[in-house]
C-alpha cells in the first residue's frame, strides 16, 4: 500500500504493513502469527527510549534499536504443571495433622492405611483413638498442629487476661465502696468523740453510776430571734449516733454510748455558751459607743 504526497513533490512514503490477508500464504500457515505486531511494538518502544535519551519527546527516531524479539506466550501447559505441586507421598505409619470434621480444629494423627486409587487415607487421632477418612491432599504436617495450638493458646490467654482485668477493677470498686460505707459518720468540722477508756472502767466499778443503757441524747436547743448569731453561720450540728442493737448491749457498748452522750452534751453546751458570750460582748460594745 502506497500513498503519494500532494503538490507534485513526487516523494512517496511507504507505510509499514501490519497485516495482509490472502497474499500467497498457504492454508496451513499460522493465522495468529503476531510477528508484525511485535516488530511494531518494539519499534515504538525503541523510538520512545531514544527520545527520552535525547531529551526531546517530540522527535522520533526512524532507526529502531536492536531489541530482542518477543516470542508469543505459549507456556500455559508449563505454568499449569508448575502450579500443581506434587502431593507428598504419604504412607501408613506417618505422623501428620488432620482437621477433625466435627469441630474444624487441627489435631495430631497417624495414618493407618492409604488408598492411592481414591487418594484417601484413614487416620487415627493421637490421644483420642477416633478414626476418620481424609483426603491425602488435606493432610497437614505435624508442625501445623503445633502452630495452631500455639495460636489458640495465645487467644485464650488474651481473653483470660481481659477477664482478670475486669474482675480486678470490679473488686477494687467494691472494696472502695465497702471502705466508704465503713467510714465513721463524723464528717463535720468537729473532732470525733474521745476513744473508749481501757478495760479498767465499766458498770459496777468505781467512778460509774450507770448500770443500764443511757437515755438518748437531748435534741439541740432551738434558736430564739434574740439569740441569732452575728456571724454568718455556725458550726454544723453533728448527727446522732446510730441506734444500738439489743443483742449488742454489753458493758463495752453501754460505756461507749455513755461517752458519746457526754460528748454531745458538752458540744451543745459549749455552742450555747458561745452564743451567750457573743451576745454579752455585743451589748458592751453598744453601751460604749
UniProtKB/Swiss-Prot annotation:
Subcellular location: Nucleus, Gem; Nucleus, Cajal body; Cytoplasm; Cytoplasmic granule
Principal cellular location given in the protein's record: nucleus
Composition bias type Pro residues, residue spans: 212-226
Occurrences of domain Tudor (ranges): 89-149
Segments for region (Required for interaction with SYNCRIP): 274-289
InterPro entries in the cross-refs: Smn1 (IPR040424), SMN_C (IPR047313), SMN_G2-BD (IPR049481), SMN_Tudor (IPR010304), Tudor (IPR002999), Tudor_SMN_eumet (IPR047298)
Record region (Disordered): 1-27, 55-88, 150-226
Gly residues: compositionally biased ranges: 1-10
Residues modified to Phosphoserine: 26, 29
Keyword NADP belongs to the record: no
SUPFAM superfamilies in the record: Tudor/PWWP/MBT
Phosphothreonine PTM sites in chain numbering: 23, 67
Any GO BP: DNA-templated transcription termination
Signal peptide extent: none
MF term (GO), any: fibroblast growth factor binding
Region of interest (Required for interaction with RPP20/POP7), ranges: 95-205
Keywords: Cell projection, Cytoplasm, Isopeptide bond, mRNA processing, mRNA splicing, Neurogenesis, Nucleus, Phosphoprotein, RNA-binding, Ubl conjugation
Record note on domains: The Tudor domain mediates association with dimethylarginines, which are common in snRNP proteins.
Complex formation: Homooligomer; may form higher order homooligomers in the dimer to octamer range. Part of the core SMN complex that contains SMN1, GEMIN2/SIP1, DDX20/GEMIN3, GEMIN4, GEMIN5, GEMIN6, GEMIN7, GEMIN8 and STRAP/UNRIP. Part of the SMN-Sm complex that contains SMN1, GEMIN2/SIP1, DDX20/GEMIN3, GEMIN4, GEMIN5, GEMIN6, GEMIN7, GEMIN8, STRAP/UNRIP and the Sm proteins SNRPB, SNRPD1, SNRPD2, SNRPD3, SNRPE, SNRPF and SNRPG. Component of an import snRNP complex composed of KPNB1, RNUT1, SMN1 and ZNF259.
Function: The SMN complex catalyzes the assembly of small nuclear ribonucleoproteins (snRNPs), the building blocks of the spliceosome, and thereby plays an important role in the splicing of cellular pre-mRNAs. Most spliceosomal snRNPs contain a common set of Sm proteins SNRPB, SNRPD1, SNRPD2, SNRPD3, SNRPE, SNRPF and SNRPG that assemble in a heptameric protein ring on the Sm site of the small nuclear RNA to form the core snRNP (Sm core).
Protein family per UniProt: Belongs to the SMN family.
Protein name: Survival motor neuron protein
Phylogenetic placement of the source organism: Eukaryota, Metazoa, Chordata, Craniata, Vertebrata
Amino acid at each position: 500500500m502506497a500513498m503519494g504526497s500532494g503538490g507534485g513533490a513526487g516523494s512517496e512514503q511507504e507505510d509499514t504493513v501490519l497485516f495482509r490477508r490472502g497474499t500467497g500464504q498457504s492454508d496451513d500457515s499460522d493465522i495468529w502469527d503476531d510477528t508484525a505486531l511485535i516488530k511494531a511494538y518494539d519499534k515504538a518502544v525503541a523510538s520512545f527510549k531514544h527520545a527520552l535519551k535525547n531529551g526531546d519527546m517530540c522527535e522520533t527516531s526512524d532507526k529502531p534499536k536492536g531489541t530482542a524479539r518477543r516470542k508469543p506466550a505459549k507456556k500455559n501447559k508449563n505454568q499449569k504443571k508448575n502450579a500443581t505441586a506434587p502431593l507428598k507421598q504419604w504412607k501408613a505409619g506417618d505422623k501428620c495433622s488432620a482437621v477433625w470434621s466435627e469441630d474444624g480444629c487441627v489435631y495430631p494423627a497417624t495414618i493407618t492405611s492409604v488408598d492411592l486409587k481414591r487418594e484417601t487415607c484413614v487416620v487415627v487421632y493421637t490421644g483420642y483413638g477416633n478414626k476418620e477418612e481424609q483426603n491425602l491432599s488435606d493432610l497437614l504436617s505435624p508442625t501445623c498442629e503445633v502452630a495452631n495450638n500455639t495460636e489458640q493458646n495465645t487467644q485464650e490467654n488474651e481473653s483470660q487476661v481481659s477477664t482478670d482485668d475486669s474482675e480486678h477493677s470490679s473488686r477494687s470498686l467494691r472494696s472502695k465502696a465497702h471502705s466508704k460505707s465503713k467510714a465513721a459518720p463524723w464528717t463535720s468540722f468537729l473532732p470525733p468523740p474521745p476513744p473508749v477508756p481501757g478495760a479498767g472502767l465499766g458498770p459496777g466499778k468505781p467512778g460509774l453510776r450507770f448500770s443500764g443503757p443511757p437515755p438518748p441524747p437531748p435534741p439541740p436547743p432551738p434558736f430564739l430571734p434574740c439569740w441569732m448569731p452575728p456571724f454568718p453561720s455556725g458550726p454544723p450540728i453533728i448527727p446522732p449516733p446510730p441506734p444500738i442493737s439489743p443483742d449488742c448491749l454489753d458493758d463495752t457498748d453501754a460505756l461507749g454510748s455513755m461517752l458519746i452522750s457526754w460528748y454531745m452534751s458538752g458540744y451543745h453546751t459549749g455552742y450555747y455558751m458561745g452564743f451567750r458570750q457573743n451576745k454579752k460582748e455585743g451589748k458592751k460594745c453598744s453601751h460604749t459607743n
